[in-house]
Amino acid sequence: MKILVDENMPYVEPLFGDLGDIIPVNGRTLTAEQVREADVLLVRSVTKVNAELLSGNNKLKFVGSATIGTDHVDLAYLAERNIPFSNAPGCNATAVGEFAFIAMLELAQRFNSPLKGKVVGIVGAGNTGTATAKCLQAYGIKVLLNDPIKAAEGDPRSFVSLETIMAQADIISLHVPITRTGEHKTKYLFDEARLKALKPNTWFVNCCRGDVIDNQALIKVKQQRDDLKLVLDVWEGEPTPLPELVPLAEFATPHIAGYSLEGKARGTFMLYQKLCQLLNITADKSLLDLLPSFNIKAVELATAPNEKALLQLARFVYDLRDDDKMFRNTFLNENGFDTMRKNHQHRREFSALALAYDGQSEVDWLSNLGFSGVGQ
């Protein structure tokens, strides 16, 4: 069995090696000719899976995408061809949630404006939005959720309108899928009018899809309003973001919010489980066995940390400033965006860092944030 797989997916060999011949490929430049003889195709969001790519293949048994979203996959075409498909919903939700939370802590430090006491509006309450809310609520931050689709489906959480978030939130964090049609389309959800209407001193975080924001309009508005603080991980026109926009962001990264080692491993592992199910064989590999131990095994925690100490704790796991600096230095290079993604040293999630508990600190909230070892 020939398994064609994006070269940037981790842990493919230990998981799929016993199931067939693994053929790594460049996901962004993948051609129909390369796919022609594949039995299994495993992709990421950079690969457009459609009739143009697959029409020459008559033996495909399974298509898997190690992503939360599916907007890069023509699901109707796969259904028409009776080709089984699976993605990995929620695989990197924790990573994105922690990324957004860390970015807010970094902004708080940079501008000497504590995160504690601010109101955060989360637009999109699916997997990544929920993970972001979990971090914030563990730290005692008031969160407003906006998700008209979840609300209509009967989700029991309390939701507010986008207008309410824009009026009340000090920080807005975007976590919606990209939809280009329909009542709740999200393409250019934040157009020039909405961007201009943001309340003074808003922190604006985008970790979902670049064209949820009109990037040209964002440049125009930001140039007029220095009070707006931007954290941008996604960009319209990836992998070539508008060069004028990058310097306007406080933190800029190349679509890597979900790039934790745990999240990437989880995405590959979910596809492994699905393929085993499809082939009616036992999935006998373990996700925990794949992950290496963290290089800093434990941190002593004598008292509940203040915000500055919490940021230092978070930086043990991931220092956003490093990726921001590297991106600014490389994004204008040929293939700089994709090269940084490909060579990214996947960060760890909070759970990789064990906290030694002395029995005196009030640290339940750190456990809720995801750190391990608390209370043990």
UniProtKB/Swiss-Prot annotation:
Catalysed reaction, written as an equation: 4-phospho-D-erythronate + NAD(+) = (R)-3-hydroxy-2-oxo-4-phosphooxybutanoate + NADH + H(+)
Binding site for NAD(+): 147, 233, 258
Pathway entry: Cofactor biosynthesis; pyridoxine 5'-phosphate biosynthesis; pyridoxine 5'-phosphate from D-erythrose 4-phosphate: step 2/5
Keywords recorded for this protein, A-Z: Cytoplasm, NAD, Oxidoreductase, Pyridoxine biosynthesis
Highest taxon above the source species: Bacteria
Pfam entry (one): DUF3410
Active site: 209, 238, 255
Gene Ontology terms describing biological process: pyridoxine biosynthetic process
GO molecular function per UniProt: 4-phosphoerythronate dehydrogenase activity; NAD binding; protein dimerization activity
GO cellular component: cytoplasm
Localization: Cytoplasm
Enzyme class: oxidoreductase
Entry's EC annotation: 1.1.1.290
Binding-site residues, substrate: 45, 67, 259
InterPro entries: D-iso_2-hydroxyacid_DH_PdxB, D-isomer_2_OHA_DH_cat_dom, D-isomer_DH_CS, D-isomer_DH_NAD-bd, Erythronate-4-P_DHase, Erythronate-4-P_DHase_dimer, NAD(P)-bd_dom_sf, PdxB_dimer_sf
HAMAP family linked to this entry: PdxB (MF_01825)
Task performed by this protein: Catalyzes the oxidation of erythronate-4-phosphate to 3-hydroxy-2-oxo-4-phosphonooxybutanoate.
Quaternary structure note: Homodimer.
Family classification: Belongs to the D-isomer specific 2-hydroxyacid dehydrogenase family. PdxB subfamily.
The protein's name in its UniProt record: Erythronate-4-phosphate dehydrogenase
Organism: Shewanella baltica (strain OS195)
Gene encoding the protein: pdxB
